[in-house]
Amino acid sequence: MISNKRKEIENINRHHEKDNDDDDSDGIDNGLLTYKKFKKDFDSGSTNYRELQIIAKSLGLASNGKKQLVYNRIEGYFLSKKVKNNLTNNETNQQEEKKEEEQQQPQPQEKQYILTFKDVEPVEIYFWKVFRNIVIFKHIFSNFKNKQYGYYDLIGCNGVFLNGKSNSMEIIIDNIKSNNNNQIIRNKYNITNIINKFKKNDEKTRSFYNLLFSRYSSTSTSLPIQLSSTIQFDEDIDKWIQRMIENVNFTALDQFIKFFKIDSEVIKKAIKIHVKPSVFGNTTYDKLKIYNYLKSINSIPTSHKLLPFISTDLSAFLSFDNKFKKLIKSYKRLIESTNLQERMEQQEQKEKIKIHPNNKKYYEKLNQKILELNEIQTSQFTNDQLNSTIKNLLNHTTPTSTSTSTSTSTSTLTLTLTPTTNLTITTSTASNNINLKDIIKKFYKSICLFFYCSVYSANERLFRKPLLYYLNFKKESVDKMYERVVNKWNGRSFDHQLFFQSILKDINIEKNEKFELILNVLDNKYVKTFEEYDHYIFFKAVFSSNDIELIDYFLKKIKQLQLNQTQKITKYPSIGKLIGDYCHLIDKKEILDFYFQNYRDECLFFKDQNEIWKQIQLELIEHYEYLMDSIGKRCKLDFYRWFDQNFLDRLNIAILKPSVYSIGFDGYFDIVSEGLVDSNIKDNKENSIINFLSNAQLKHPLSLEIFESSFNPYTSKMLTFIKFLFNNISKESIETKLKVINLKTDNKSFEEINSKIELTTTLTATTTTTTTTTTTKTTTTTTTTANLLSPKKSKDVGCLTIGKTESFNFTISIRMLLVCLYNLDRVDDIIYLFDKLPEVLFNPDYFSIFTNEYCIYGISSSYYLELFINYFIANINDNTINYLYNCLCIASKKGYTQIFKNIISSDQNSKYLLKIQTKSNQSSLFNSKLLNDIVVKSINSLNFELSNLLIDFIDFSAKDKNSLKMKILKLK
């Protein structure tokens, strides 16, 4: 037996390159090992580990890892080959059939050839003709601003790109269709990110995945040659099935199976080898959809039967924030996934006794509920109802009659406990009067019973229905429901909060019952279960209801209780403190008016010079100002809570209305100004900063050290602010400031050199308008000329001068000055400054940081990067050679292949840049190690097309070339 295996292995080594892996063959055809022969003769347990390694190597597979891993790798290879052969055979048969049909058709006297484009609109053909013409393409895009943000430079589909661009799918589709050398998708990790991102089950997403599979398969003729060897779905079928299941993407998995016509046995094997059984144990709504789908096409291996929902979060299925249609689908997926009748029988056999009477009772209840739901027709559900949340439906439920629906077919919910469970939900024209709340309750009850029978029957203590289930479906008094909270939920603070808020906001509960609840809490009826220090939970529930009647009743009862208490014993806070503590919950003007008319003397936020106004929601500030102005009172603002989220917005409001606000800042405000700018940039509040700087003059220059640490993460958020800062700053004024640095460099020691410069931003009506236009495009807040340039009179308030600001100063480092100019598309100005002041800008202490990889990598485009490279080549010196090398490293890391192709096409540049410096070639700039590092960066970034281009062109030794190629093979 061993000798026979040895012969087979030798045959593999001699013949494995031949493509004859037909799974239906009875033996080894022409000496080749087939899937059946492999499974028959090479058992994972008895086969020698060394023999498996030889087979793996002969097939071009990795041979490292444990024995079972190597075995699974070989098995997966054969499964993929089977799918590929089936796909090829199908296409061959279709081509032969098509050829026969064409031969049978009468031949025209003169042949006419028509080029057709599948799935492409006629007008789109002209677009692609322009798009693929590099000369026209570059000419068009050279006229666009913000070239560094052009999508044609995007390399790789990472989370930043996929989540940061709302049209990321369209960009990928355009890039695939363009079929140019600059492909966004570079490797399998990019594909995995795509699978993790696009999961919606609609026609657009399904079409997207079909395009993806057609381009990245071994039969594709459109794919660039360099990518076809690294990404082929049909060469790695089992691994892609694993990735789609683990990323819980039903749409991709469904289209993948259909596109490549993968049979159930291949899917079963792939799941068994690569997907852990526990994946389906932690059951979610979306995982259930995949599980039921695989089950419906008979593709679930016996080892992966759905575990009994051990790690399932019941609250996710029963959330009242879910849409009604999701509740129906949850019910469907749960019931379809499990044969409850079979589970009952298995439990009886396992225990060798009849099932516990209580458990049997629950199974019977569930069966009864399923039968009841089978009788429900869904014609009374409108699209609005199906797309509404359960919470909203329960707050507006009335008996509903039959309503118009988009479908006219008739069927019912059909569910049984038999192995052939079936469920359909369509519409019927039958007239019906059914209470929607009762229907929702039946679905909830069924899901609860299902989980109890499947998971919690062995330990009833662990099972409890959500609190909202009792609050919405149990027809009990408020007192009775509160007892349930205490008995079933042990009276936790969170449950008390949920209970009080739900009761007080429920429009279906009578006001008298709510009044009774308030009275019972204040009279200590629940003192044993509701501690006094937890009263703030109840207070918050009352004020958050924003119900004037409830709040008024509550405050009057508090007042009565306080009158009955001695001065030394004050159980509850004062009325004024209560209202002030919860004023942030006020969400409508009527509540403010209510306090103003009835509790003005008690309310702290109606006092003169109060600071509590900062807690009132910004949407209500204008009405609040009107009330304060009507009684001649003012609010106070200092910088004590400068880090609050809306502080700068409130400061801008206060600056514009000095009759209502008094502002007082001492010298410490200069210290916190940087943090204020930083926090508002992170919160996308660039307009708030611009408003502030336009209406308040700092007595010291604004330091922009924040740019040093925060520029990279917040580049797009800062763009409007940067435009505002540099709008009226010319390159000549920057040159003047840099000349001062140059003088200091010549005459002072290094320690005395100040690497920062101070610039002045001039504010004019034109500046304001420009800023406003830009801001309007990028944010929802609009800024007008009027509110930027008022008030007219200046006023000193400590370290600030409030009033119309004509200009302000700021300091910025030379490095960040260059970065800002770059992001404003003022690269021509950078080149101008290079020429005028090379001794300053090319000073390693200043400029080297700008060209460091971590800085320029995040902002560079191929367009500008090539511009810098060409400039450094034309101005080579001891400093610029280092900057040139850094730019080449970035181009390699980002996969800008065209930059290197342009260098190679130039005989002079290629000799300087991409040939190794030796004794015989002193004209070259870089030694072997530096050039090797450039190639390694492209390999580590999985840009293999560029890697192979550089390996072939650079005159590395044979040893170095082999070493680099091995790095590529390991990452493929």
From Swiss-Prot:
InterPro entries: SAP_dom (IPR003034), UPF0746_actin_org (IPR051904). Residues 1-19 have a biased composition (Basic and acidic residues). Keywords: DNA-binding. GO terms for molecular function: DNA binding. It comes from the Eukaryota. PROSITE patterns: SAP (PS50800). Residues 44-78 form the SAP domain. Residues 1-30 are annotated as: Disordered. The keyword DNA-binding applies. Belongs to the UPF0746 family. This is UPF0746 protein DDB_G0280785.
